[in-house]
């Protein structure tokens, strides 16, 4: 079975319901308030287990990341990025949403991940180099896909903080654990001027 991961922007009016999931998905509030299920307090993100979610009284702009079978169903919003993802041979999967915050000049040394995912820059600037490719400069709103197999080097803007949101499909066996694998294992013990905030880390059924 062929799958793709896609990033969609949804603009919701005040109190409007978010898209009902037809596939495993994460919703992240870019602006405005997002409320999951019967909750009365806003949350940064909701995961696949939250079947109902809606915007707050001022509306909301959401990033929706879905894992869809090919051919994909209608998106129902503005598709910012869609990329095939290889899920062959897995014994079980989870959907993870986290935010990565770099201090000015922060660097993520060459690394891989245990699964693929989509990233979207929220603020700052990030120079991303995948394998032997040319560096790519990503600005706020820019999205990219990492398979997890190729080594990636990321360098944040020197003059300001940089942040991106990430939704990835990881082996279920690493729930609650980091997915990162450094090309040079010594980098794992060196200073890392960046912070991770995990919002969603839920098993999914394909």
Label every PLM stretch briefly:
Residues 175-206:
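Acidic/histidine-enriched, glycine/proline-rich intrinsically disordered or flexible terminal extensions
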Residues 1-25, 30, 65-68, 75-106, ...:
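A short glycine-rich, His/Asp/Glu-containing loop-to-beta-strand
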Residues 96-143:
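A contiguous binding-surface segment within folded domains or other stable secondary-structure elements
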Residues 22, 48-78, 148-177:
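Ligand-binding loop in jelly-roll beta-barrel domains
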Residues 17-21, 108-113, 130, 155-157:
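Short histidine-centered beta-strand/loop micro-motifs
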Residues 9-13, 26-56, 102, 130-151:
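Short acidic-glycine-tyrosine-enriched beta hairpin
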Residues 84, 141-143, 185-190:
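Short amphipathic alpha-helical linker/capping segments at the junctions of internal repeats
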Residues 22-36, 113-128, 164-171:
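Short, conserved beta-strand element in jelly-roll/cupin
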